[in-house]
Structure formats: structure tokens, C-alpha cells
């Protein structure tokens, strides 16, 4: 009996990297292939397609500074991870290795390259991440979520396929739920999230914005907010004082369904979040994470803002007064909310997992 080919999926240990890997894994398994995940220890927090039996943890390290000590530590950890990954390649003999970004993908992709195993990288950002940028010249094929990501590197043009960001089954199910435009007196459902790791700025700014809303609008609100454990008592006490109907939690396992059931999403603008908002088609207020060297979240938010599907607010401008004004304007304009939902859908790609699976299978078969 012939064993089905194995595809190794390498991803950093956060949702933005892991969820597209999971979506591709589901599609490849439907096609009769085997899959395994190579990642770092953070990924073990996530439930999903990849059980511990299907996961290999490889040592890795993110660059945390430019000092000689920090660079040396990173180099040593990546070298150790590459040694472990080389042994994995020898034992598992994958048909191809697919990387989804993050420094933990460097050891398995480098090891695959050294052993002559076909390689693909996928990047969900509007600006390619540093790990993928390093790997881009060394892999067989590059998949991007958006066109034009590597326009400044014409030498790579022959490797690039625009596939979109693969969506998990839960997102595809949520995408089938139409946007329910609220009437002027109807409940207004607002979801506040800060990415897979939470965001303290949401706990610092959103409560003050809610307090500044007109009492009639506050009474309409049904608020769901991701709040870190250390901020929970403070935020809950604030909303209790205002008598706001609010559900607070540090993490929502059913986030896709919650995205679909809300009228306005307030969030960071990680690549995965932006792709999911486009796929599901929901109006959003996006606050890019500041301080990134390549400003990837600012560019990601622009993908939705430029078509009218989102409002982008840079963090220095993200104040209680500004947020209250934006929420008040959206609540007073149901037609605008409906138009934003429709606009957001124009950037969604529901067939991305299939398109990426086609590319991976071709590279595994031909090496090109």
C-alpha cells in the first residue's frame, strides 16, 4: 500500500501564522495528502487541526535587539533549530515544506533547502515579513495574499502567485452569514479584539469612548470585548458603572462566529484579521500596531480602508473622543455600515486555500 505524500507546514506560534496553515492543512487532507505542523512552543496553546501528535516543536528565537549578545543568542537558537529540523527532514521525508512566516519557520525551511526538498512560502501581509523576505530568494515558490507585495523585487516575479489568505472552515461558515444592517433604534453589536495576544490599548481607550456616547446610544450597545486578565477587573467595573451590556473575556475560541454576528469590529490590523474581515464582510475600525519597522499593520489596514470597508486610526489619534465620534457617526448611518460591509467583501478571497493547495502540489510534484 502506497503512503500518501507528506506536506510539512511551518508557522510561527501565533494565530496570524497558524490559522492559514490550518486552512491549507484541511484542504490538503481533503485531497488525500498527509500534513504535519512544525512550529515553536507557543502554538501548543491553540486547538485546531494540529494535535500534539501532528506537531513538531523546533527551537527558534525572534530577533529582540541589535546588540551583539541578542544577535548571537538568536543565531545560536536558529542554528540549534536547524539541526533539529534537518533530522526531522531525514526521518519524515516530506514531499514539500510550506512556510507561513515568523522566525520559527527559518529552521525548517533552511533544512528543507539543504536537503533538496521543494519549498513554498506564503505571506498574508501587505508588506512581506522579515523571515519570509530572508527566505524569498531561497525557496521554489512564493504565495502572497495581495498583488504587488514584491513589486520592488522584480527578480522574484517568476516565483510569485497571488492566492489570497487561506481561510479556516469556521471563517468560511461565518462568511455565509449576511450582514444584518441595524435600524436606527435597534441594538448595535460591537466587538473589540486585540489580535491573538490581546491589546492593552483597547482596554485603555474603548471604555472612555463608550462613556462619551449619548445615553440613548449606550443603551443600544451590546459590547463584546477581548480583555487581558490583568485588565479585567478595571474594565468590568467601568462598564458595570455605566450599565453597559458587555461580555468580556481574554480569548474567544468562537471568534469567527462573533465576527459574523457583530455590526462593528474594533481591532488591530494583523494580516489574518484583515483577511477575515474581508472574507466575512464586516465594517471595522482598525488601529495598526505602532513601532513596526516595516509598518505592516498600517499597510494591512489600508487594504480595507482604501476600498471603504474600514476606518484606519493610527494609535496616537486613537483617543476616547475620536473613537466616540466614529462610533456615533456609524451608529447614525445604517446605510454607511451596509456599504462598508459590502466594500470589505470585495477584498476577501474564499478560494485561497484551494489556490494555495494547487501551488503546493505542483511544487511538490515538479520542484517548480
UniProtKB/Swiss-Prot annotation:
Broad enzyme group: transferase
InterPro entries from the UniProt entry: GlcNAc_MurG, Glyco_trans_28_C, GlycoTrans_28_N
Entry GO CC: plasma membrane
Subcellular location per the Swiss-Prot or TrEMBL entry: Cell inner membrane
Keywords: Cell cycle, Cell division, Cell inner membrane, Cell membrane, Cell shape, Cell wall biogenesis/degradation, Glycosyltransferase, Membrane, Peptidoglycan synthesis, Transferase
Enzyme Commission code(s) on record: 2.4.1.227
Membrane topology qualifier: Peripheral membrane protein
Pfam families on file: Glyco_tran_28_C, Glyco_transf_28
Binding, UDP-N-acetyl-alpha-D-glucosamine: 14-16, 125, 168, 196, 297
GO molecular-function terms, A-Z: UDP-N-acetyl-D-glucosamine:N-acetylmuramoyl-L-alanyl-D-glutamyl-meso-2,6-diaminopimelyl-D-alanyl-D-alanine-diphosphoundecaprenol 4-beta-N-acetylglucosaminlytransferase activity; undecaprenyldiphospho-muramoylpentapeptide beta-N-acetylglucosaminyltransferase activity
Catalytic activity: di-trans,octa-cis-undecaprenyl diphospho-N-acetyl-alpha-D-muramoyl-L-alanyl-D-glutamyl-meso-2,6-diaminopimeloyl-D-alanyl-D-alanine + UDP-N-acetyl-alpha-D-glucosamine = di-trans,octa-cis-undecaprenyl diphospho-[N-acetyl-alpha-D-glucosaminyl-(1->4)]-N-acetyl-alpha-D-muramoyl-L-alanyl-D-glutamyl-meso-2,6-diaminopimeloyl-D-alanyl-D-alanine + UDP + H(+)
Keyword Cell inner membrane carried by entry: yes
Any one GO biological process: cell division
Pathway(s) this gene product operates in, as recorded in its UniProt entry: Cell wall biogenesis; peptidoglycan biosynthesis
Entry keyword Glycosyltransferase: yes
HAMAP family: MurG
Role this protein plays: Cell wall formation. Catalyzes the transfer of a GlcNAc subunit on undecaprenyl-pyrophosphoryl-MurNAc-pentapeptide (lipid intermediate I) to form undecaprenyl-pyrophosphoryl-MurNAc-(pentapeptide)GlcNAc (lipid intermediate II).
Family designation: Belongs to the glycosyltransferase 28 family. MurG subfamily.
Name recorded for this polypeptide: UDP-N-acetylglucosamine--N-acetylmuramyl-(pentapeptide) pyrophosphoryl-undecaprenol N-acetylglucosamine transferase
Taxonomic source organism: Nitrobacter winogradskyi (strain ATCC 25391 / DSM 10237 / CIP 104748 / NCIMB 11846 / Nb-255)
